[in-house]
């Protein structure tokens, strides 16, 4: 139900979990202190990212089809994060927590991922951001073309 089965793997640098049917939380993931890449795909019971903020070395976070996650607030504490993929994850409350992610270079939130508050302004304040991929939605503050132009200008 959490990351406790991995507790003795502190030297692990990359972890890809494909269809972890029992995973409900990120509790215990902090024991993977050298982890630089974490990918979770089709984690149908995972409903919170709380605990992920303990991964001080994490550079790449990929969430694919993790549809119960509504908040990305814990991601804000990942100071070395350069890539964040949140693809086909349903409804995300806001991307405002990313406003402090100064090292973030890539942010993909496409397919069914839908930012409920529609505020994409935080992307414009990220000094390292080079790539942002998302679907155009009527209530979003910016179109993909507007964000691309701002990032390349």
Go through each PLM region and give its residues.
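Concave beta-strand-loop units of leucine-rich repeat
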Residues: 1-93, 97-153
């Amino acid at each position: 139900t959490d990351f406790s089965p991995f507790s003795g793997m502190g030297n692990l640098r990359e972890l890809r979990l494909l269809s972890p049917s029992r995973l409900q939380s990120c509790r215990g993931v902090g024991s993977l202190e050298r982890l630089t890449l974490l990918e979770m795909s089709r984690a149908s019971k995972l409903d919170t990212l709380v605990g992920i903020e303990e991964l001080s070395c994490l550079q790449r976070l990929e969430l694919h089809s993790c549809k119960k996650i509504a908040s990305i607030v814990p991601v804000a504490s990942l100071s070395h994060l350069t890539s964040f993929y949140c693809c086909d994850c349903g409804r995300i409350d806001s991307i405002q927590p990313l406003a402090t992610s100064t090292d973030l270079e890539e942010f993909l939130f496409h397919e069914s991922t839908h930012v409920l508050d529609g505020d994409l302004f935080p992307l414009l304040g990220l000094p390292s951001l080079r790539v942002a991929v998302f679907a155009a939605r009527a209530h979003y503050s910016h179109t993909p073309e507007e964000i691309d132009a701002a990032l390349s200008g």
